[in-house]
Amino acid sequence: MAKRALGLGQKNKEKKRKVDNSNSNNEPNRNSPAPGADQIQVEMDENADLDDELTQLKGLWNNYFHSDRESEYVLNGIIHECDRLLRQSDSDEKTKKLLNDEFYAIYALALSELTIFKTEQEGEDVSQYFDQALEWAEIGMEKTSKDSQLLQLAVSKIILQRIPLQFISKLTVDSKPEDVNLDLFEQLQRAKKCFNVEKDLELAYEVLQMFDDLLDMLENFGHGNNIDEGLDSDEEDEIEPVKLNKKHPLYRLQKAIPENYAWLKETMVKLFENIEETTLRRNVARTLGHLFLKAAEEPTSVFMQQYDDEDEEEETEDKEVPKEIKQAQKEALSHTRTALDYLEKAQVEDEPETWVEVAEAYIDLGNLHDYQSSEQEKAYKVAEDILKKANRASHGRFQDILDNLLAKDQD
């Protein structure tokens, strides 16, 4: 399986964010307009009301949300504009009516995003930004609707951004309960409870990606620089989770990893079923493919152990396969077939790497079938055909994978 791309939580730790020089060392003054805020370029929908201040704010947020998110300057501009509208609403009824759940969600999410930059500034306490972000989301629910799905989703995102940045990044395997001032397990439960997939599907997908990143961090907690650098899937198979003391702040979260992966898969499937937009649907399908391949790893390991045992012992003819091996094979095949279904839906016509992910899943499928069976040969042949096509389209970029498969066929 190809190397897993680092997600938001890990990118924040390993990637140096670019910070605008004019704002890098100074806390923004919320009682004055953002310096040069009127110079920020904002792309608006052609049907948008350009005189509507909330529409302008939404345009600014969407620009940031769909960018590479490397501008603290833009975030400060969003926060200053939110502050300005709040002050203006005290004396202007028209402005007051603009402050709906979208406004409060933008304010809360912008404050939460700001922590990405603040973690890089020595001595900066990000807890205040997360506290304010949650406070504005809660104020928004009080002012608009407690049932606002957007604000609930914002709360979920803020919590999932907070746990890694404020807490996990500072913890070690020897940390004590008093090292954190929140029950992180209960915080994650709250994030799950607040999550929903009916609206704001792009934001919902990002939240689930952050959930996935968090589980990955918990699995690899205590393995030092491996978390920062990212782990190849082959390396992940060899690394056992560090066993934490029962009083460790992450102990309950670590114990809940399997059930949380199950929740993630189930919830991601619901999200996929609600999406019609092509690009987002493909992205979610690709993530689901990887999640189901991951689910197949443990039963695959159990199934493949029989071949390792045969290398150590003399093979006996007609040796009966243990029941647990057969069950593991069945489970791994089920997960891998489901992964294949999603990865095929994630293919992009002019992106050969998406075809190769399908080919690699077919190789996994072949490995799970009985040795030299017709099912195994068929799976390998499909993988070979896809790899040859991808190799031609990419001028030999995937030759190594193809060579490895052909060598397997000759064994």
Curated annotation (Swiss-Prot):
It is found in: Nucleus. It comes from Zygosaccharomyces rouxii (strain ATCC 2623 / CBS 732 / NBRC 1130 / NCYC 568 / NRRL Y-229). The keyword Nucleotide-binding does not apply. GO terms for cellular component: nucleus. Its main location: nucleus. The gene is ETT1. Required for correct translation termination and probably involved in regulation of hypoxic gene expression. Belongs to the ETT1 family. Residues 1-38 are annotated as: Disordered. Residues 21-35 have a biased composition (Low complexity). The keyword Membrane does not apply. This is Enhancer of translation termination 1. Keywords: Nucleus, Transcription, Transcription regulation, Translation regulation. It comes from the Eukaryota. Pfam families: Nro1. GO terms for biological process: positive regulation of SREBP signaling pathway; regulation of translation. InterPro entries: Nro1/ETT1 (IPR024318).
